[in-house]
Amino acid sequence: MIKLECLQDPSPRKRRTKLLGRGPSSGHGKTSSRGHKGDCSRSGYKRRFGYEGGGVPLYRRVPTRGFSHKRFDKCVEEITTQRLNEIFDNGAEVSLEALKERKVIHRETSRVKVILKGALDKKLVWKDAAIVLSEGVKSLIEAV
């Protein structure tokens, strides 16, 4: 959430400082660019931080809390055939729960894609519909 006290002044541009009250030829003489009368012309006056001349300031234009789709996104992880070879025994059932128990995938993961890298020597039973096999892995399983 954006807070008023968290806002920072934008870094000043590298520009020559304005010399005020140094005669009419300077362009900033007499009233020192403050105009005639009013609060702004008096000494001791300072504009409030974030003030943009009466328009709606940035910290009020920007929504304080937005919406992120991250909570609802499906968490998909990739796992290689080489890693499956190391983890599972021959004839073992491969499911999301089995992968989570062995701490191969994160507990938030809702889908797994198996990618061909290395050989898959073992005959595995694919239990879960959430486990997607790449084309290379499918052809490798059919060959085994």
From Swiss-Prot:
GO terms for molecular function: rRNA binding; structural constituent of ribosome. One of its GO terms (cellular component) is cytosolic large ribosomal subunit. The keyword DNA repair does not apply. GO terms for biological process: translation. Disulfide bonds: none annotated. Keywords: Ribonucleoprotein, Ribosomal protein, RNA-binding, rRNA-binding. InterPro entries: Ribosomal_uL15, Ribosomal_uL15/eL18, Ribosomal_uL15/eL18_sf, Ribosomal_uL15_bac-type. Part of the 50S ribosomal subunit. This is Large ribosomal subunit protein uL15. The gene is rplO.
